[in-house]
Amino acid sequence: MALPDFSMRQLLEAGAHFGHQSHRWNPKMQPFIFGTRNNIHIIDLAQTVPALYQALQAVSDTVAKGGRVLFVGTKRQAADVVADSARRSAQYFVNSRWLGGTLTNWKTISGSIQRLRKVDEVLAGGGQGLTKKERLMLSREKDKLEKALGGIKDMGGVPDLLFVIDTNKEQLAIKEAKRLGIPVAAIVDTNCDPDGITYVVPANDDAGRAIALYCDLIARAAIDGISRGQGALGLDIGASEEPVAEELPANLNEPEVAQVDISEPYVGEPFELLAAPRGAPDDLTKLTGVGPQLVQKLNDAGIYHYWQIAAMAPEDVAKVDAELKLNGRIARDGWINQARAFVEAAAAA
């Protein structure tokens, strides 16, 4: 794959060149303004094009290194497209009110996310033992938490880059990112302050069609990063546009693993779940998309070693996938292929 391509004509047709009324401008945007028409500032798209390419490259590079990108757009015309774009590129989003401390107080936010998971589990089980009123209250709590945290509940930690629509509205998010040294790529209109933005993309941040174009390009850049990152590991990316529950591989410096034909029967110990690891457990975070939380989930289910995953038959995959609610990740992310490669590498060492 490669970075998504776009043209100045696409930006023009989407209305990306229309700024705000000239009396509502921020003087710091003067270098990006082409002129004025009918008392409306016109943005210089000759600067927008290379700036947007730079932002796309930053997104792709961040994801290729195993980083997370957080889409931030809480205004009405951006909310839906921000969520859709983040989901299809396996990234994260905030499209409702930004909660203070989302980045700078991640520990507290994580507690709220755990509460959301607990409520989800209770309601998924039918709310047994609860009264009708208690179930209703839990359902309302879930809706409230899902609206605020649904886009980041699987993020697993602070993001590595923010993509922001409307820097005026999302000032709090930008301040938190700046405090933590997290780079920010943002669509900056003529009434905005470009200071503190790592990748300034001068463009209209109000037109729905323009916002859809920006988000689509950023999503495709993230997908390109996933392809590059997994390609560097010698992996088949499979359905790379599916969201992942944990972070992407954090270490791209692992030696490239050989491909294994999983259609061949596995020669080794048969698959079984263990009450405890046999010796030291294997580092399951080397598997694509597996982070500490998912390792704990696998351990709780009785999976500690590569050989267990390598020995899985289709019926084992289906059972474990269903019990742990992995949404097809064992097959999609190639865990069996990777586990067999690690087992063979250990045997050859």
UniProtKB/Swiss-Prot annotation:
Listed name of the protein: Small ribosomal subunit protein uS2
GO molecular function: structural constituent of ribosome
Biological-process GO terms, alphabetical: translation
Matching HAMAP family: Ribosomal_uS2_B (MF_00291_B)
Family: Belongs to the universal ribosomal protein uS2 family.
NCBIfam families documented for this protein: PRK12311.1, rpsB_bact
InterPro entries reported in the protein's UniProt record: Ribosomal_uS2, Ribosomal_uS2_bac/mit/plastid, Ribosomal_uS2_CS, Ribosomal_uS2_flav_dom_sf
One of the record's GO cellular component terms: cytosolic small ribosomal subunit
Keywords: Ribonucleoprotein, Ribosomal protein
